[in-house]
Amino acid sequence: MRTMKRLLSYLRYEKKGVLVGLVCLLLSTGATLTGPLVAKHIIDNVITPMGQAHVFNAGGLLLWVGIYVTVNLVGVAGAYLNRVYMRTLSNRIAKRIRDEVFEHVQTLPVSYFDHLPAGKVVSRITSDTESVRANFYVSGISTLFSTIVMLVGVYITIFLLNATLGLVLLFLVPVMILWQRTVATKQKKYYSENRELYGQLSGQLNESIQGAGIVQAFQQEEKIVAEYDATATSWVEVGRKELILESYFSWSLVGMLRNITHFGVIYYFSMQFIGGTLGISAGLLYAFIDYINRIYEPIQTFMNVVSGFQ
């Protein structure tokens, strides 16, 4: 948590970029949430009356289809601009962090490098900062913002359409928060080992290239290759375990909850239909299913990048 707060503090240097990115994100989210409402209107107020009257209203249909396409284009444009601004400011922040690390290395005593390979130092300055840029600022922060904004917007819309369904769907939030914390705890171990082994690989590779003449002079080629293979094998094994854990905990649970929610919504409205109290149209049912999917999409994306926050 302390590391995350420190990384978040660098956003103060890019206030303008963050503000513009948030505005673009709000624009994109607003357009995305408006799309299902427009589709609902098309189904209930354009297509259904045409079917009942057996009259094809081409003008009205084209008008609302055009509105639907425009809304989606606005959402795409907002998402694109948000991605551009977030990636741009993440590059500038990564440069600042890399410069600070490099300046800090210059002040370290010589004894610090006695037992630390030069390749590992280089790895910390280059690859580790690149990992922070890609996993935290590009994927993590952007995903976190979009997830929060999208979830708040979806729940507000669902509550406006049907307060009962909105209250029922609220149980998903604590379930996903608890699950995310469980996944983060388990992934932290593998992620730390992954970064440590990657640094060792970089250090061994750097040393073997710089000291190639000495290695050959003392005929240590087989030993160097064996050490590198052992480290590489450990790195691959840790990566495999991390991938299995991430795939199982993120995709499996989210997919299962989505299917259960779909079943629950369909069952709820089916019982109303059988009891003769169904007060929902085809368009409204479509909107509910669409918004339920939009609840899980940001959560699923966030679960896939949660390892980058470790």
Predicted regions located by residue number:
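Juxtamembrane helix-loop junctions of ABC transporter transmembrane domains
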Residues: 24, 31-47, 71-118, 122-126, ...
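Transmembrane helix-loop-helix hairpins at lipid-water interfaces of multipass membrane proteins
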Residues: 18-78, 159-164, 263, 267, ...
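An intracellular "coupling" helix at the cytosolic face of ABC transporter transmembrane type-1 domains
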Residues: 110-111, 129-141, 186-203, 207, ...
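Transmembrane helices of ABC transporter permease
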Residues: 17-27, 68, 138, 142-193, ...
